[in-house]
Each structure stands twice: as C-alpha cells, then as structure tokens.
C-alpha cells in the first residue's frame, strides 16, 4: 500500500475518524516515511504539546510505529498504512460480530476499536459495557431462573452479575481469535522487528561459530522463530475444546435428533439451554459453566487478520450459494466455520504471488464427522441430492422396492451413517468443477474435507475482473478474455478461430480493451529487419498487471468518495452541528422546521450513498489484495 492513492485514502480515513491533528501527523509521516521527533515537529509545524499528545494517541490506535535505535538512541516514527485502511472495514466487522456472537459482543468489539487497545480491568469500569438495568414496569416477560418477580418490583437483581457478562464475552471473542493480546513488538514495524531478531540470533555464542551457508540458514530460521514468539498474541490457548472455541453454539434441533446428539453437545454446550435463545450464536451457559474472569492485566486489541479469514469465508459461501442449493450451502458453511477456527490468517506472505507462481495452500483437514455435527439435524439433506442408491432393482410395475429403513422400522440404526453419507454427498457436489469449492482427503482411513484457499482466492479475483470487463465491454469481450486467459498469447487469426467471432467485431473489441488496459499486444519480429509485414502480433491477457491497475483505480475511487463526503459535510457544517446537539438529537420533529427536516433527510441519503459505495469498493480491495 505504498501507492499515491492508497496513501491519500488512508490520510482521509484518519481525518474522517480522528480529526485534523491525527491527519496532519499521519500525512507528514506518509510524505517523509520515517522521522525523528524534532524532524516531525519541523515538517508538521505543530507544537510539542500537540505532537506528543497526538503521537501517544495514534500509537495507542496502532496508526504509528515507533522504534528506538540501538546506535544513537533516537526514536523514529513511521505510519502504519494497513491499520489506517482497516478503519474503512470497521462497520463490516461489527456487523459480522453481531451476527456471529450477538449485540453485546459487537458493543464490546466497538469499544475496543474505539480505544485502539484496552486493558481488561479498564473495560470493567466502562458504563457502556454494563447491561441495561431491568425495567421496573413489568414490561419484560418471564426471566430465567424465576427472577421475573424481582424485576417487576424494580429490584436490580442483576447488578452483581453484570460484570460477569463482560468476561464470557471477552473469552468468546478471544477463543474465536477476533481479539488477541498486545505485545511490545506489535508497536514496531515488521522490518524493525526482523532486524532486532536477526541481531539477537547472530549474537548467540553457538551461531557465532558457524560460517557460510549454514550460518545463513540458521540465522534465517532463528529469525522467523523469534519473530513468531515476539509477535504472537494468541489467546485461544485454553479456550478451545475439541477444536471448537468456547461459546460456539453447535446447530441443533429438537426431538429424537436432538436426543441423539445430546451426549456430544455436553462437551461444550449446556444441554438445558433454553430454545428461545437459539437465535443468539452463543450464551453464557454455553461456556460450559466457566465463569472465571480473564486476567485483568491483559491488554487486548482487534485481530484484523483473523477477521479477514472470516470475511473471506463469507465470500466463499456466497460463491457456493450462487451455484448450489441452499441446503448444500449450509453444509459448506459448517465446513468453513470449522476451518475458520483453526486458520489464523489468509496468507503467509504479505504480497500475492504472480499467476502461475503461487503454490497450493490447503486448509486444515476437517473430519467428515465433525462437519456432520456442525449441520442442523433438522435440515433436510436428502431432499436436494436425489436418491441415495441409484442401482436399486426396479420391479415389474416400474417402481423401486421400499426398504425397511424407508418405512421407519430400522430408522434408529441407520440414521447416523445415512446422515454422514448425505453430508459427504453435498460436499462432493461442491468439489465439482468449475469452482472446486472443496477437496476430499483420506488420512489414516478417516475421510476429511479441506478447502484450497489460493485456488478459490484466484477464482474470486478472476470473477471480479470478468464481471468488470463484461459490464464495460459486453459479453463478446468476456469471451475473448476467457480464451486469452486459457490459451495464453495468440495471434489475431488463431484468436478468431477459437472465439468464433467475425474479424470486424474481434478487432473492435480488442482495440477498445487495449485502450482500457485490459489486453496487451506483443510484437515478435521474424527477422532482424523488424518490418511490420514480417512481424507477428500476439494478443495476451495479464491478470496480475490488471489486478494492480484495478486496485489503484479502486483506491482512487474510494478517495474521491471520501473527499466528496468531506466537502458535503463542510458545506452543511452549521446545520449538522445543530442536528448533533444533545437537545435536538432524537427530537428532530420538535426542534427542526419542515425545510430542515427535508434537508436532513437528503443529507442522510447522500451520506449513505457515498459510504455504501466505499463499502462496496472495499469488497473489491479485499478480493484483489487481502484474500
């Protein structure tokens, strides 16, 4: 993210979220990349007080790295562009957390985002993280545990239990990997940490005795290991049980299916859980009765890399929903969720390798039985995949004979293997071309299923590029692009033969796409004279170059949307300040005239339009860069 428009977008996001002081410091660091405090003061034209307060707050939000040199003892500061960009994804993340873990978890995550990082003991003192007191008018219906009478009388019986709600929620977020512990090395850039780790490895007595290639290999291996130790803030240890995070609710129904799986659920879900809470993803009871509070001295922050994994899985699920039945998509969701629990980040490398140079990267294998446990027992799996046994004998009347299991006489004995088989069939459907959403593996005689991340990430990028090309140039251009992508470099004659297009239409499409930068032309001379008549012209499609170009255009479009939003805010500054007053907010009908109400409605519609466009463009950035 070192391009011009990416830096411009990050500065606008910082200004929009934190104000002009943060934006000036961030822009100055962007322009000069790495500065000491005196030089930063000189270039930013800020006072010592402003600069120190601004830097301390920006360091808390991880917007600025700082590093003290071993040579001269001077502290240097540099911007963290990735943390600044993640500001645009905060709303999407909070929406996902609320959908997965509930409203209170989203409120807690929002608070941690607002603070940058926070100590658990400090979070206990915040009033916004305390649940609302029960109403005294008896509007709320029956409470669990026979507490309805005390609530109707207005007694605050939950006051002593309110702090206990924070810690199970923190444990749920930590066990899912959505928050992690803050380490000292996280305040420094990766390059500075790598240099420190390399210096520490080289200073070891056993390493000093090595020479040549052995020394280089030992230093490289030791540096990587030491970096992982210093940067590791994982809090999931001790909070995972049987591969599941504490607080994760397994899908379950009622009746015989629920009774069959009751014993398995007891490992991590309370069997007496109220069915009215099934709409919530987790509850305190599902923590297995663990009410031990987290250590108050732990400092936590948001784990954006893990959240990228969860958001990427949602895109994979959307791809499955487009090309399969809803039942198959739900089975795929269970597999992806199990994989998410054991996947820390989308990619090991920061940059996406070029097409053809990127190796396969399979997810952790998930046992078929584990996927079956994740699927709702009430889900009709057989209804969308047809008959299970195709080779059954047909009688004289043209009908297959009914088995005992169909009549229900042998249902209990065949239900478990039958359901496992059905889940396997749905996953097999997903493994078919063209998307190959799953892959089957047999490990030690155990059937497991995995997902090939890099293949699906490439597929998402190609689909995004094809959608854009079709929208700009039509379906004929899309056909040409697919031919070039599949066959490589082709001359015009061979391209016409494969695409089955008239020369006139083909040349028009190629010319328009070349002017737009989607296809390129390579000249291959047949002799040293390089005459046009003795030259072969090859058309080709380079998805890597186009991806970089589209990504830059997307940054530019997002930047223009943020600039337009800032302009509109400044134009209506006095009016918006009036609407944000504490006496006016929530009472607009009372304090605003009809013309002002109309203006406020127009402003909200315009703001929603611009922010919605930024969110849509962020989806494209995630596909092109992060997944």
UniProtKB/Swiss-Prot annotation:
It is found in: Nucleus. SUPFAM superfamilies: Winged helix' DNA-binding domain (SSF46785). Residues 131-162, 238-291, 394-420 are annotated as: Disordered. One of its GO terms (molecular function) is single-stranded DNA binding. Keywords: DNA-directed RNA polymerase, Nucleus, Transcription, Zinc. One of its GO terms (cellular component) is RNA polymerase III complex. InterPro entries: POLR3C_WHD (IPR055207), RNA_pol_III_RPC82-rel_HTH (IPR013197), RNA_pol_III_Rpc82_C (IPR008806), RPC3 (IPR039748), WH-like_DNA-bd_sf (IPR036388), WH_DNA-bd_sf (IPR036390). Signal peptide: none annotated. Residues 554-575 are annotated as: Leucine-zipper. It comes from the Eukaryota. GO terms for biological process: DNA-templated transcription. Residues 144-153, 269-288 have a biased composition (Acidic residues). Component of the RNA polymerase III (Pol III) complex consisting of 17 subunits. Belongs to the RNA polymerase beta chain family. DNA-dependent RNA polymerase catalyzes the transcription of DNA into RNA using the four ribonucleoside triphosphates as substrates. Specific core component of RNA polymerase III which synthesizes small RNAs, such as 5S rRNA and tRNAs. PANTHER family: DNA-DIRECTED RNA POLYMERASE III SUBUNIT RPC3, RNA POLYMERASE III DNA DIRECTED -RELATED. This is DNA-directed RNA polymerase III subunit rpc3. The gene is rpc82.
